[in-house]
Regions:
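Surface "functional belts" at beta-alpha junctions
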Residues: 23, 35, 90-194, 223, ...
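Acyltransferase
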Residues: 185-240
Length: 240
């Protein structure tokens, strides 16, 4: 019996999922304008109450650790730290692009394209993109090839990429495809998919089965970038 609570607040959405054994996960997911802090804990309580279990009876808590919105990533980690310390539960950190990839493989457009390699790219603000390459596997979730990168849209490497997904598509358009030699790539897209607790949960289940749960004191955010915003001088030079 495996019971995992999954949380993600690294984007503009508050997202919580509860998985009990092989049952369909309970899932709450909503776009939030002023951060997820007011929704997160009540939602967790709601899911636990509906399932008639308490927090301490969980096996682990999964959390999206970024990259994404700095304040959202911090909120999620702080909330999980409070919950895990109180209950002595282990945690399962999940990188946001991995969570997107885990859900993407079920999307109709992706299934129709059946790519071997694909790219997940999300808007990182400041004219930059968080991105990573993935490879599909015969069974289970896709495998990330290397670390998550942070570059300008034009610098994204698209060699052998057959499908592109993520918020960077709508934000940067043709700039993303500057280095693509594949004229069909612009038709193999999923611009709407984003990170959610269901994707976090899918990755976390694999981590749990592989024995990769961590002590809460090992939990760290994945920011990729160390800087939150342009300075006034940088904004002036870039005409922002």
């Amino acid at each position: 019996l495996t019971r995992i609570l999954a949380i993600d607040t690294s984007s503009a959405w508050c997202s919580v999922a509860l998985s009990i054994d092989d049952e369909r996960p309970a899932f709450l997911h909503q776009k939030v304008s002023a951060g997820a802090s007011q929704l997160l804990l009540p939602w967790i309580e709601q899911l636990l109450n509906t399932a008639k279990i308490n927090l301490s009876s969980l096996d682990a808590i999964a959390i999206g650790v970024g990259p994404g919105a700095f304040t959202g990533v911090r909120l999620g980690l702080a909330s999980v730290q409070g919950l895990a310390v109180a209950t002595k539960l282990p945690v399962l950190p999940v990188i946001s692009l991995d969570a997107i990839a885990a859900e993407l493989i079920k999307a109709p457009a992706f299934l129709a394209a059946a790519p071997k390699r694909f790219l997940v790219a999300i808007d990182a603000r400041m004219n930059e993109v968080y991105w990573a390459h993935y490879e599909t596997t015969p069974s289970g979730l896709p495998v990330r090839l290397g670390e998550v990168a942070l570059t300008s849209p034009e610098s994204i490497v698209l060699d052998d990429i057959e499908f592109v997904a993520g918020s960077a598509i709508n934000e940067y358009g043709d700039r993303l495809f500057a280095r693509s030699k594949n004229v069909f790539l612009k038709t193999q897209l999923d611009p709407e998919i984003g990170v959610s607790a269901l994707g976090v949960l899918a990755c976390a289940k694999l981590s749990w089965c592989a024995g990769l749960a961590q002590d809460i004191h090992q939990l760290e955010p994945v920011y990729v970038r160390n800087k939150v915003a342009f300075t006034a001088e940088e904004r002036k030079q870039a005409n922002i």
